[in-house]
A protein has these predicted regions:
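Hydrophobic membrane-embedded segments
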Residues: 1-35, 45-47, 51-135
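Membrane-anchoring hydrophobic segments
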Residues: 20-33, 47, 171-172, 182, ...
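Alpha-helical transmembrane segments of polytopic integral membrane proteins
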Residues: 33, 37, 131-144, 206, ...
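Membrane-water interface at transmembrane helix exits
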Residues: 41, 45, 68, 72, ...
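Juxtamembrane/interface helices at transmembrane-helix boundaries
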Residues: 46-49, 73, 77, 106-184, ...
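Short helix/loop segments within enzyme catalytic domains
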Residues: 74, 201, 225-267
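Active-site recognition of the HExxH zinc-binding catalytic motif
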Residues: 190-203, 210, 238-239
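A Zn2+-metalloprotease active-site environment signal
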Residues: 201-231
Length: 267
């Protein structure tokens, strides 16, 4: 028979670790992290570092804002917690009574009625928005591919020029520059120089990466803001390439005005 001497159980416990975090907490952390990263970009990086650094930071910020909240990063080192475990004396054999009744089985915890309704509705709405966003992106890419097949292609070395009368606004996608009719002389050269800058810096690949993340985190307004800022950096970098090539600023502004280049990048 044991004498009831208390025992000691030691177990490491890490502060801030409470198991898997809830979806709501993860969403809040995603919003906080993405907002913090974009605030840092706006305050400390815009017009202070190169266009390349701005592009890389914005793309990395979009991915990190989704990855960092998913990590279980401890804020404090693990500490050892001592739990006293009293040893209970065994009862005498003659006082032991055996029960024949069965203990009731523990049933599943049924959530409240509104939770049973709200959870599938929220999941269904989220997945619907994701599939729609990815579907629209796929349709746009398929449309660009079909347009390329119908266009007259010219190998220009660093890029492929696709010309078609139905192209209203010049744009570039991956290694292809799309150009409509009516572009001759220096106007044509300036527009091609602008679009060649997008191809050279692989702007389309960055836009596609951000679009994919935005399709999964469509509820995050900061991802949409990051995409718009990234597009602005792309345009600034392409503009700088045109001016560095020796074209006059006033002439370039005139060409851009009549070309309506605010929509020059579609993807």
């Amino acid at each position: 028979m044991f004498r009831g001497v208390p025992g000691v159980c030691t177990a490491p416990k890490r502060a801030g670790s409470a198991g898997m975090k809830s979806p709501l907490l993860y969403i809040l952390e995603v919003l906080f992290c993405s907002g913090l990263l974009l605030a840092f970009y706006r305050l400390l990086l815009v017009r202070k570092v190169s266009f390349r650094a701005c592009r890389r930071y914005l793309v990395a910020a979009v991915f990190l804002s989704a990855v960092i909240p998913a990590l279980d990063i401890p804020l404090y080192p693990a500490r050892t917690v001592v739990y006293p475990l009293p040893l209970i004396a065994a009862p005498p054999a003659e006082n032991f009574v055996q029960t024949t009744g069965e203990l009731p089985a523990a049933g599943p915890v049924v959530p409240a009625g509104w939770r049973r309704i709200l959870r599938p509705v929220a999941v269904g709405g989220y997945l619907t928005a994701v599939f729609l966003s990815l579907g629209f992106l796929a349709v746009r890419m398929v449309g660009i591919r079909r347009l390329r097949r119908r266009s007259r292609l010219t190998d220009c070395g660093a890029y492929t020029l696709a010309e078609h009368p139905q192209i209203a606004t010049p744009f570039s996608f991956l290694r292809t520059v799309f150009l409509g009719g009516g572009y001759e002389g220096r106007r044509r050269m300036i527009v091609l120089c602008h679009e060649a800058g997008h191809v050279r810096h692989r702007h389309s690949a960055e836009r596609i990466a951000v679009e994919l993340v935005r399709s999964l985190f469509w509820f995050n307004p900061f991802v949409w803001i990051a995409g718009r800022w990234l597009q602005e950096v792309h345009e600034w970098e392409a503009d700088r390439g045109v001016l560095d090539a020796g074209y006059d600023l006033t002439e370039y502004r005139t060409v851009i005005f009549f070309t309506n280049s605010s929509a020059i990048i579609r993807i």
